[in-house]
């Protein structure tokens, strides 16, 4: 178990209250101590089972409780998923994330999920899944199949959480993260900005994440995507500086974690995204829809990477796979790039 300093709420609040430019400077300094600031890790996310979720998360179009026009789909066939993973690899992603709209997976689904993980790993990609609550046996089985990362977000602070979700407790989420960690799988966990939370709630979320026995290796920070039909469709927009500030504080508090720009990037300007990279974000979802929300078209990402001089990160599992690295670099920096993968069309 890792030993790291525990943060206090007053320390986190102090960070959020820092003058913006001072905060950015501190975050960038810490970022450079642990990462190459020119490198960004690239992931692709595929919804392997969409809609009809029994949970009541007020932000989510996948909930069966809200009329969002989202058509429910059954669990995809293994070969369909692996075909999508091949396309993702050819487009340059180094991690393939598979998400299912469940409260928890059923044991009958586990053999298919294990085959998906094994197939993705055989391609030389990192494998990540987000399937809801796991029990010990399921976590161990996914670990044995080779799963690298498991995503299970805390979403917000413990104090605000009950305003967003009532069908799953905060402790259930923490318990799943513990089971995943004990099974030897890396943890991916973050939250959402724009749920109607206060700055103290954002501080409380990051406090929970940073004070886990081992902080998450990957911390996705989402900006709420307002979907018609959900209770949060009319929420106020998030101020760009408030979002960037959250990224910066996450970077300072979890200096060795990958901080990922996730949902909501489509509604961010290039300037906002650039400031997020300055604040310490060093991972993105590339070229697909984030489960059911739009993500910027790949060519826009290519252009932004080129403008900022950013390069895709080579992950540990792909060390020595120069062909893979060159493919993505060619797509990112050649003006006449061809078609890119979009999971939504599969």
From Swiss-Prot:
Keywords: 2Fe-2S, 4Fe-4S, Biotin biosynthesis, Iron, Iron-sulfur, Metal-binding, S-adenosyl-L-methionine, Transferase. It holds the Pfam family Radical_SAM. Its EC number is 2.8.1.6. Its cofactor is [4Fe-4S] cluster; [2Fe-2S] cluster. NCBIfam families: bioB. Belongs to the radical SAM superfamily. Biotin synthase family. This is Biotin synthase. The gene is bioB.
């Amino acid at each position: 178990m890792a030993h790291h300093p525990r943060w206090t709420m007053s320390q986190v609040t102090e960070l959020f209250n820092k003058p913006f430019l001072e905060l950015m400077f501190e975050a960038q300094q810490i970022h450079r101590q642990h990462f190459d600031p020119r490198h960004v890790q690239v992931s692709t996310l595929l919804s392997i089972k969409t809609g009809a979720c029994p949970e009541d998360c007020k932000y989510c179009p996948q909930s069966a409780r809200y009329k969002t026009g989202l058509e429910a789909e059954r669990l995809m066939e293994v070969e369909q998923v692996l075909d999508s993973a091949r396309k993702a690899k050819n487009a340059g992603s180094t991690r393939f994330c598979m998400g299912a709209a469940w409260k928890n997976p059923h044991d009958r689904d586990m053999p298919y999920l294990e085959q998906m993980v094994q197939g993705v790993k055989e391609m030389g990609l990192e494998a990540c899944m987000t399937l809801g609550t796991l029990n010990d046996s399921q976590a161990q089985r996914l670990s044995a199949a080779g799963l690298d990362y498991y995503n299970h977000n805390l979403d917000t602070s413990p104090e605000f959480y009950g305003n967003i979700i009532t069908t799953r407790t905060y402790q259930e989420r923490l318990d799943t993260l513990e089971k995943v960690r004990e099974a030897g799988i890396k943890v991916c966990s973050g939250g959402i900005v724009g749920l109607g939370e206060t700055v103290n709630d954002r501080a409380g979320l990051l406090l929970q994440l940073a004070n886990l026995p081992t902080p998450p290796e990957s911390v996705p920070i989402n900006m709420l995507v307002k979907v018609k039909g959900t209770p949060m469709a009319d929420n106020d927009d998030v101020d760009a500086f408030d979002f960037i500030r959250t990224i910066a504080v996450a970077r300072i508090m979890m200096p060795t974690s990958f901080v990922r720009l996730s949902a909501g990037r489509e509604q961010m300007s290039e300037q906002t995204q650039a400031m997020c990279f300055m604040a310490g974000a060093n991972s993105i979802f590339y070229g697909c829809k984030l489960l059911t929300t739009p993500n910027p078209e790949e060519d826009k990402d290519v252009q932004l990477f080129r403008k900022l001089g950013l390069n895709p990160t080579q992950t540990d599992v792909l060390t020595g796979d120069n062909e893979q690295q060159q493919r993505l670099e060619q797509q990112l920096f050649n003006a006449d790039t061809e078609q890119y993968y979009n999971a939504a069309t599969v």
